[in-house]
Amino acid sequence: MAETYSTLAALFTDIADAIREKTGATATIVADDFPDVIRNVLQVKTYLTFSSPSSFTLKVNDTTKHWDGILEYSTDTSTWSTWDGTTTLSSATSRSDNVLYLRGTGNTVITGNGNKDSYKWVLTGSNITCIGNIENLLDYATVESGNHPTMADYCYYYMFYGCTGLTQAPALPATTLTTYCYSNMFYGCTALTHAPALPATTLATSCYQNMFRGCTSLTQAPALPATTLAPGCYT
């Protein structure tokens, strides 16, 4: 049954909480700003946003590029630089937060089939949210056009393994999955409090294997709408 509200204030408070949960923001939303805030939330973002109240860094565990196209990073969404995977990226201050933005072009895989967690990404910091559509790392122009980029096997394999400072996961909107694509993706993310929605209806071998293993702060599992399963998909 849909929730009812006794006052408009209660309704707007709930809407504000939902917006903050979606965007990762913490500031109070005043009534006059509601229309613009909602419009901004509804706009398609063509990048992935990492955000924290404190400074943080991001690197590839073995300082090697494993994506098969281009990844770019920015701290202001205006100036973008190519990331070759060999350097450590640092956040920059934006208002009350520290932020780092990433987007990709022509990628079908981000981490790939390494030796377990050898190709993982390492986030060093605390209270880090990852906001936006993960597919922006594959090809942001495809996402902007309303489509899903092609995803290869082992696409996000072990990507955030052991990232204990990650508190919010990105959206995972793909509806057709590939072998081991999300396997071990959030393994050991002990600060993760909510699992992202998993809308996929076409599964693949071991696609979700150990995806949330060791996520000790999760209290509720996501809905699993697929009606036809694949070998090891939920192991």
Where are the model-predicted features located?
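Noncatalytic modules at the cell exterior or secretory-pathway interfaces
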Residues: F56-L58, S91-T108
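Surface-exposed loop/edge segments in extracytoplasmic proteins
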Residues: D76-G85
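Extracellular ectodomain segments of secreted/surface proteins
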Residues: L42-H66, N136-Y140
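Exposed beta-strand and adjacent loop surfaces of beta-rich binding modules
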Residues: A16, H66-I70
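Structural signature of tandem-repeat unit edges
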Residues: L48-S51, D84-A92, L102, I110-G112, ...
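Surface-exposed receptor/substrate recognition regions of extracellular proteins
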Residues: M1-T49
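Conserved Ser/Thr-centered positions that define the repeating blades of beta-propeller domains
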Residues: I70-D76
